[in-house]
Amino acid sequence: LERLADLAEAIPTLRRIVLDPIVETPRGTLALSASVHLREAPVECDERASHLTVAPASRVEEVWSAGDRTLTLRALRENDFFRLEAFLDRLSDETKFLRFHTRAPITQAVVSELTQLNYDLENAWGLFEGDEIRAVVRWSADAEGLSAEFGVVVEERFQRLGLASRLMRHIEAEVFSRGVGRLSGLVLRENAGMNRLMTKLGYAANESDEPDSLVWSKTLRYKDFS
């Protein structure tokens, strides 16, 4: 295990190593098979070993301008539950439908999912104006951490300011830094604005199991973030 840790420290492009199966022998533990998975990243470690540094999501904040307004981007936390609930309540029925693909009321369970997160595999970011949330973007990776799904929603009077585009680029960079190589999202065919945004950001559309939706996907590459 120490040698595997040394490899992870020395080689930034190393995504994961799988040793399977592992059996016990009279002389100790033996791995009968192994595989190595790489990601797009420099092969050599920089002086700061930056590939090993992950800032605590809850402490990262950015200040954005949107027209004449100043917004703060930060990760959602458990104590944001009521702020998030108020944000979702302010959305129109149509905006909620385009985001959640249902006309049913948004339950407290949905709100909890966005504030009680496993930061190893998911994150949700809110754009705050003072104490009020104006937009939310979320990503959630699969169990292996190789691909992730996204969702984004912006309050109506803050739409058409380029916020959704900036939020998408923010999570693209974040998930790529975590080793995720592909980002995908399910978008209703009737959501013309989101479908245009996906095209603008370089996503490719594929048919979905749901006839009223498209799956937009993008392969994330090191050159896009270097």
Where are these regions (language model features)?
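A long amphipathic alpha-helix within ATP-dependent nucleotide-binding catalytic cores
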Residues: L1-L19
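Conserved metal-phosphate-binding beta-hairpin within the catalytic cores
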Residues: T13-V36, F150
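Long, contiguous binding/interaction regions
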Residues: P42-S226
